[in-house]
Amino acid sequence: MAPSEPKKTFRARLAEKLAASRFFTFSALIHAVILFLVGGVVLFKHYAELPDFTAPTGRLVTDEGRVEAPPEQRPDFTEQIYLPPAPQITAPKLNAITTTNVSTLPIEVAEAAPIVKAPVVDAINKVPANVTPGRPRGVTGPLPATMSARIGGARGRAMVLNGGKWESEAAVLRGLRWLVKVQNRDGSWGGSGQSGAMTGFALLSFLGHGETPVSPEFGPAVQKALVWLTQNGTKFDGRLSMKTEFDSSGVYAHAIAAYALGEYYTMTKDERVIDLLKQAVGYIVDGQAPDGSWAYGYAKNRPGHVSPGDTSISGWQIQALKATHLTGLNIPGVDQALDNAMVDLKRVQCPNGGFGYKGPDDNRFSLTGVGVLCTYLWTQKKDKSVMDGIDCLMAGTEKEYPVLYQGEKADLYAWYYDTQACLMVGGDAWTKWNTMFQTEITNAQAPDGSWPPMRSAPPAVGAFQTESGGGGVLYRTNLCILMLEVYYRYLPTTK
């Protein structure tokens, strides 16, 4: 009989069990680590593709990266961007019309609108209480309240409060990235004869998103565009249409580019563009007709015409002048020209609330938004003129002019104004308009970030809506970007 083995202690038996199971334990641990890592990658990929409008840091986080907090002191633009020195130029003589000039016309003269001081964030009571603007890199000093939500964390909060969706903000980013890809080597956009307008449009799109020359992703594109605009604007003596004389389309191009230059100065306080801005705005002020309108070529008098100007041209001049007013530079003639423009808009308003091309008997539905927006931009009042215009706009849209990108009566030019006008008025008009336009414009975007040709177009716009190349794709893309930036680009304000 074999001798019995000595009884093993508890510790010995435990050691044997652990030794036998060590390979199983190691294998299980490795598999658990792998599953954790794979799951983390999937979740990261999912959330990285979505703009984060609720970042706890107070800054908007989008898929182009986190917007860093600005330095407390003003950024040194001399070292970080390379604009040419401001040219020593003299603005054209500002023969701004006066109320007396207007009163000689057979129309009732409206009381001159009081000068609207550019409000700052702390002084405004119409900005939502929980929108606290930040200042990303390149933005200097407090912005006027109406522009305060285009930067930092305020952008995301304004998006949510005003009914924006992450899909529309993602479309804006795709559009801006497309603009970067198609920018000309010299910094401009568009071909010969269109570069002034298209570069101005593109700058407005970038600035509307809070981008400056020192922005992480879009800064280089903005910088190159400003170099091109300032160099060529100086070359053509402040004519931002980039021609020696103002032709028919030149008054549009000039005003659009001046509009962008005014916004740029307001956001950065870059003093090197002041002289060029003064000269450019001088042409607009000096080119206003006696009745407060603007005409092709800035012609002040046209024999046989009741008015030398038209509402379509006036719309861009008014936007450029309001942007100039917001700079705080107090350029002579600007406020008076805006007062006079309000007199003209009252003159051309139609009995149904719409606005005429040259007068109240020349009603154009596409100009209704022009009249409403431009009136509100300067008067900052929801008066009878504005509300009658909004009623006309909404009734016409719902009954005859639906917001359909590929519809028979599609009109991006009108929608650009209508979108802003409805936001400024707010209420049911904005709720209905936002429902009609936001998804339609977002879904119409092409995969590359541009907006494709449309099936039809109003005669006044023509090929810009329907052509596949040329300036048309730039025109469509910029207007759509600006529409989708409406939630934060300009906020309704009061005096």
Region roles according to the model:
Residues 15-33:
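Membrane interfacial helix-start segments of signal peptides and signal-anchor transmembrane helices
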Residues 133-174, 188-221, 234-282, 286-340, ...:
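An alpha-helical repeat/solenoid feature that recognizes helix-turn-helix modules
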Residues 20-22, 176, 281:
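Short hydrophobic "helix-edge" motifs at membrane interfaces and signal-peptide entry regions
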